[in-house]
Amino acid sequence: MARIPLEFLSITLPVLLLAYCLAIEYEVSLPTIAHTSPASNPEEYLQSIYEQLNLDLPSTCTVNHLSAFDNTPTSLLNFSTSPVEHFDAPKLPSGLNATAGEQWAFDGTSSSGRSGLLLGIYRDASYAFLGPGNFRLSLDLVWDNSTTWSTVDYLSSSTVHTCTDKVVGIWSHSADHYYVFTVTADAKHARIHFHTPDVVGAVDLYSTTPARYPDGALFPSEVSVTQNAPMLHWVEPIPGGLIDVDLKVKDTPFRWTGLGGHERWWSAKGWLDLMTHWEAVRLMAGPYVLSFWQPTSRVNGVAYPSAFLTKYGEKVFSAVSGKVSEVEDYILYSPVRMEKQARETGYEVELVSPAQGRRWVFGLEYRNQEFEFELGDAAGGRAYVGRAKGGEVHADDKPEEPSEGVFFIEHVDVKALTVPRAYVVVSFEFGPPIHGADIWVAC
C-alpha cells in the first residue's frame, strides 16, 4: 500500500561516503546544488493541463500551491488532525519543513493475481538532501509474465484543489509532464491521469467500501482520531474497490481490472525516523474486502495493527490488536513456508471477534513479486500480488463455502536504517539527469 524509494539510498550512501572521504583527504572544495527549474511558468502550464483534462474547477475551491524548492517555514506548521476534514485535502497546507510530510497512495491487483500497481504521490522533504526537491512520485508495476518496472519521478510543483464535491491534485513539471488525481467528496470514485514521456493513460478506482479511520470507525466521525502511531497519521478513503487500469508504459500496454484501494498518510517526521517495520495487506475474495496496515514505531517499539473487514460493502469486523484475547477483537498474521524454504510463499490471516463469537480465515498465496529492495544490515522490503481464498469459520469449525479472489501484500524492515543528518554536496556524474538538471548527488 505504501512505499518510499529506499533502494535509492542503498546506491547513493556508499558513493557519498566515499566522496566525503575523498573530499576530506584531498581538501576538495564542494559546490552547492543547482536546483531544477520547471520547463515554464507554472501558471501557464497548469492552465494547459486544466484544458487538456477538461477540469472545470469553480472559484469556490480552495487552492493550495507549493513549489519543489520553497523555503522551509521557520514558524510552526499548520498540521491538520481534524477527523471530519476531507481525507484527501492537504494536511500541511502552509508548506513543508525538514521533517513533516504527507502522501497520497493508490494500489491495485489484477483479477489474475499476477499484475499489480503501486503509486505513491508525495509532499515530503525527507530526501531533500538528495537535491531534486520535495515532490516525488514512485510507481511500481508488475505484469502477468513477472516483468517489473519502477520509477521515481521528481516534479516542480504541487497544486491541490479542495472543492465541495472533490479534491484534485496536480503534480507537474510542464504541460507535457504531469500526474493528476481526482477523488470525489464521498470517496466513491478516484481517477489518476498519467502524462509523462514514459507513462500515459489513466486509472479509475470505484469504492465498494466505506472510508474509515485507524480504529475502524467509519467516516465521518467527530470523535475518531487520525493518529495511527506516535506522530503518524493514516486514514483510508477507499479500503477496497474495483480498479480499471489503462496505461501505456514506454509503448507497452498495461491494461487490466481487479482490486484497488487508496490511503493517506501524514507525519511530523520522516518514515525512517518514525518506523522500524511496516506491513500492509489488501484483499478481495467474493463478498469480502480486507484492509490491514501495521506500522511498528521507532519511538516506543510498539506495533499498531489496524484491520478492517467488510462483506457486501458493510463493515463486519475491525481490530487494533494483534494479540489473542477473550474480550478484544484481534488479528493474527503469520507467514506460510514450504518445507526447507527460507522465505514464505504466502500468509494466513485470521480475524477473531470474541464478542460476536465469529472468526474469519484467509489464505494468501504469492503469484508475482511487485518489488524488492535490500539495504544491508537486514533492512529492505518486498511486495507481492497473488490469489486469496477464505471466509468465515463457524463455531463448529466448519467454514462457509470459501470465497476466492486476489490480494496485495507488503513487508518493509528499516530497523537498522536511518537517514544521515550530516549533509555534504558533491558534483560528479551519477545516472541520468533529472529534468535536465546538472549532474549531482547530495548526502
Curated annotation (Swiss-Prot):
SUPFAM superfamilies: AttH-like (SSF159245). The keyword tRNA processing does not apply. Its EC number is 5.5.1.-. Pathway: Secondary metabolite biosynthesis. Residues 1-23 form the signal peptide. Glycans are attached at N78, N97, N145. Belongs to the Diels-Alderase family. This is Diels-Alderase poxQ. Induction: Expression is positively regulated by the oxaleimides biosynthesis cluster-specific transcription factor poxB. GO terms for molecular function: isomerase activity. It is an enzyme of class 5 (isomerase). Pfam families: DA_C, DA_N. Diels-Alderase; part of the gene cluster that mediates the biosynthesis of oxaleimides, cytotoxic compounds containing an unusual disubstituted succinimide moiety. The first step of the pathway is provided by the HR-PKS poxF that serves in a new mode of collaborative biosynthesis with the PKS-NRPS poxE, by providing the olefin containing amino acid substrate via the synthesis of an ACP-bound dec-4-enoate. Keywords: Glycoprotein, Isomerase, Signal.
